[in-house]
């Protein structure tokens, strides 16, 4: 399996949301996660992010979906990129306020740096969290 194929499998598992159990075979243990987004400030590993997504997509906004618009892979930097829109409605517990019934359609980008074993060794998420939080009625 190629690095890009594994990156795609990780992306799909993370967004489905399969949680860490569904993602860990594609990720190096302890792989760092970064995002300059308010809700994710304390999330520092890919494992923690996968679990955060699973909680959001099964408890806070069950049934959330995504549309993948484009993806690519840079062989020189071993980096996969995925640009998508996340669709979610706040119908469950777990947000900063009781369920609002409001929805978001929020763009985001993942950058996944792969190692020589074709596993994710670092993840960066670019996401305008305030946009999503406003749409969900959280701000």
Task: Please state what every model-predicted region is.
Residues 1-139:
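C-terminal and inter-domain tail/linker signature
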């Amino acid at each position: 399996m190629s690095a890009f194929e594994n990156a795609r499998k990780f992306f799909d598992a993370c967004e489905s949301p399969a949680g860490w159990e569904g993602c860990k075979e594609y990720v190096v243990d302890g792989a760092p996660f970064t995002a300059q987004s308010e809700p994710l400030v304390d999330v520092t590993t890919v494992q923690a992010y996968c679990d955060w997504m699973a909680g959001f997509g099964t408890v806070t906004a069950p049934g959330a979906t995504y549309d993948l618009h484009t993806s690519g892979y840079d062989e020189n930097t071993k980096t996969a990129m995925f640009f998508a829109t996340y669709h979610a409605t706040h119908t469950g517990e777990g947000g900063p306020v009781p369920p609002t019934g409001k929805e978001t359609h929020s763009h985001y980008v993942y950058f996944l740096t792969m190692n020589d074993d074709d596993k994710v060794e670092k993840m960066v998420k670019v996401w305008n969290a305030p946009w999503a939080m406003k749409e969900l009625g959280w701000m």
